[in-house]
A protein has these predicted regions:
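Cofactor-binding beta-sheet edge motifs in enzyme active sites
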Residues: 2-25, 32-722
């Protein structure tokens, strides 16, 4: 029999989940955490011991996914965790989106059915293993009773229970009805990691075949009988409202069904998308632009810089920072990051059918239950009368943590008696986003004997959590905005972090892939390179001297130095830059090699990343997420910026909010460290590693210490600091 160790449900809930909780947002633990072995589904003809597993009498194994799939590989990894402990036949595993239900499928960290913060595997690692092990134990018990033997004499493997002494076997499908009658055990045995069969193997993704053959259904793919199409124009100025609408020309166009006017937007419903689009273009709209019509990016930065001079709320303070900064070689710098849009390949959309007594929604969202509750308010219905059908997301990146597109679609659909698919154009999507905030991170440090003796860090910027999850905003501190500032990996004896809340004039802000560490990691790692130069030390050796209490971080840094060829001679104007970071309970070190020509153009030559993510459930997914995250972050560093003029976003599509292209992408090598530690998060780690590593490569190649993104090529050509 496989070796196992016993873990009680109480230990999982009070120990495992609480630990995962602290690794995320450090939020107060909710009163009623998820108990994954309940409830059972008593539908005849299948074995459904808990909310996650369904096995019918043919052996078909359906796993219910509490997290959403938006390209990050979660469906495959979560399925592997369940199937590992269930000892399922991987070839028979299918996945389904779980319906909205916080009690059954609420993320154990947040208490909400939400996907984000590189949290899926971390949050569900123990609960889903327990759910799978519980189901396996019930199947084994059913077989043992049928054979008249002890359960301990039976083994489970690949969807079968076997009794070696007699040579008998029964498939899970054959045992489904009998197992359904078993009482779920209170304590279950989960596998010793040494006995893993699926976890740790490079598994092919379960969603790939349907994405290749076109069967995969995204939110935008929903098609219903009698459905019409709509598109919208929102007030171009944030906070503005609809004034007058002349729809006389629009309603005469073939296929145009209705013009719907809301407070801040106008929609045209048509028989098809083209009719809706042409109808919208034919409208004459006068906007009441409101008080924000003259706001510019310059105004926003002036406000932020002024706010950053205030004393902030103290998030962490160790040692005597004033004394430390009064001695040694002093260093001061401020690092600034711009607004960024999400620009998912699938623009925001929702299909809605509102009836007098019910509302049904088809979309792709990262937060199903919030969508359900907000849609209920918009429809004027009880929550239990709202059905949310969630589909694959064509990119989320935090944008689909917001319910605004569904709220608008419900309000539009209330005006008619048929289902309506509402699709925002790329232009409307980019110009009416909830943007990654502008941030200003100030660092004051002192050097004594070649090491940092004092480190004072002040973050100024938007408090996204104050809006999105108010209980997390306490004592004037947004714990997301200072996440990697308080969790810097280095041994700083005198360490002080402050936060100043500064909301940008009129511009809505939200989470963006990488969340709080976006700004923190960039500032910390850029400052460390500048301090290394000030101390006359190699950047990697400088970091190593202050990582002695962080062995996992030290190990990946050593490996990346070796694998990247750190220290080997480079041609003129070619540099290597490094970034190290603890990231969502993972540890990643990255080296970017880049060439900068005489006019400031940048060529990425090579990227090397070493990541210790604990037990890598699917190493292929880890590599893919680091590769994709690096390109996502480097795109922002090279090109990403949303600017405001006269209260309007100036960018509109990929021609002026551009993405990195294939010919610009260098060779990327990702090394996944084998580890027995609990899994860390991986979906966002690469995003935050790329920008500072590139900036430090530029610094090494040119001596130009850039302190603002996106990278200004003119400054590189001129050889100036910015």
């Amino acid at each position: 029999m496989n070796a196992h160790h016993s873990v009680s449900r109480r230990a999982v809930l009070t120990g495992g989940l609480a630990t995962g909780f602290l690794l995320a947002f450090h939020l107060p633990l909710r009163a009623a955490v998820n108990e994954p072995v309940q409830p059972r589904d008593t539908t005849e003809g299948k074995f459904a011991p808990n909310a996650f597993i369904r096995i019918d009498k043919t052996g078909r194994t359906v796993l219910m996914m509490p997290q959403v799939e938006m390209g990050q590989g979660t469906y495959t990894s979560i399925s592997a965790v369940l199937a590992e402990e269930l000892d399922a036949d991987w070839s028979k595993v299918e996945v389904q989106h779980a319906p909205p239900n916080d009690k059954l499928y609420g993320n154990p960290t947040f208490g909400l059915q939400v996907t984000g913060n590189s949290n899926s595997i971390r949050a569900w690692w123990l609960p889903l293993r327990q759910a799978g092990a519980t189901a396996r134990a019930m199947l084994v018990q059913a077989a043992a009773i049928q054979w008249g033997v002890e359960p301990a004499s039976c083994t489970a493997s690949k969807g079968e229970v076997a009794h070696a002494a007699s040579g008998r076997k029964l498939g899970y499908g054959e045992l489904a009805l009998a197992a359904q009658g078993q009482t779920p055990p209170k304590d279950v045995a989960i596998k010793d990691p040494r006995d893993f069969v699926l976890i740790g193997q490079p598994l092919k993704r379960l969603d790939t075949p349907d994405k290749v053959n076109g069967k995969a259904i995204y939110g935008i793919d929903a098609i219903l009988p009698g459905m019409k199409f709509a598109t919208v124009a929102a007030c171009p100025v944030f906070g503005g409202k609809v004034g007058k609408v002349d729809d006389s020309a629009a309603v005469k166009l073939p296929g145009v069904r209705k013009v719907v006017v809301l407070d801040d937007m106008v929609a045209v419903i048509g028989d098809h998308m083209w009719a809706a689009k042409k109808g919208l273009e034919a409208l004459k709209i006068e906007w009441n632009e409101g008080p924000n019509a003259e706001i510019t990016t310059k105004d926003i930065w002036e406000d932020l810089r002024k706010a950053s001079q205030k004393d902030g709320a103290v998030a962490k303070s160790d040692g005597d920072i004033a004394k430390a900064l009064a001695s040694g070689d002093r260093f001061e710098a401020a690092y600034e990051l711009p607004f960024l849009a999400h620009a998912s390949m699938e623009p925001i959309n929702a299909t809605v059918h509102v009836r007098p007594d019910a509302c049904e929604i088809w979309t792709g969202t990262q937060i199903m239950t919030r969508v359900q509750s907000e849609a209920a308010k918009a429809a004027g219905l009880p929550v239990d009368k709202v059905i949310v059908n969630n589909h694959l997301l064509g990119g989320g990146f935090g944008r689909k943590l917001e319910p605004d597109m569904v709220i608008a679609a419900v309000k539009i659909a209330r005006q008619v008696d048929y289902p309506v698919k509402v699709v925002w154009t790329r232009e409307e999507d980019i110009q009416h986003d909830v943007y990654r905030p502008v941030y200003r991170d100030q660092i004051t440090a002192s050097l004594v004997d070649g090491k940092v003796s004092g480190w004072k860090y002040k973050v100024a910027g938007s408090a996204v959590l104050a809006r999105w999850l108010p209980p997390a905003f306490q004592k004037g501190i947004d714990i997301d905005a200072i996440d990697a500032a308080v969790d810097a990996p280095y041994d700083f004896a005198n360490f002080h972090v402050e936060y100043v809340r500064a909301e940008p004039l009129s511009v809505p802000t939200g989470f963006w892939r990488g969340v709080g560490p976006n700004n923190n990691v960039f500032a910390v790692e850029c400052a460390m390179d500048e301090l290394a130069r000030k101390a006359g030390k190699d950047p990697i050796e400088f970091r190593k001297s202050m990582l002695t209490k962080n062995p996992r971080m030290l190990a990946v840094l050593g490996q990346v130095a070796e694998r990247s060829g750190w220290g080997q001679k480079l041609p003129p104007r070619v540099g290597r830059g490094v970034c190290v970071q603890p990231s969502f309970a993972s540890f990643i070190a990255t080296v970017v090699e880049a060439e900068i020509d005489d006019i400031g153009e940048i060529t990425l030559r090579r990227i090397t990343s070493v990541v210790d993510t604990g037990i890598a459930v699917n190493p292929d997914t880890v590599k893919a997420q680091i590769e994709g995250g690096l390109i996502f972050g480097l795109t922002a560093a090279l090109y990403g910026e949303i600017t405001i003029d006269k209260g309007r976003v100036q960018q509109s599509n990929f021609h002026d909010y551009r993405m990195m292209r294939i010919n610009e992408t260098p060779k990327v090598e990702v090394i996944v460290v084998k580890s027995g530690e609990a899994p860390g998060g991986i979906g966002e780690a690469g995003v935050n590693a790329g920008p500072p590593a590139l900036r430090n490569a530029i610094y090494a190649a040119t001596g130009v210490a850039l302190r603002r993104l996106p990278i200004d090529r003119k400054l590189l050509a001129a050889g100036k600091k910015a």
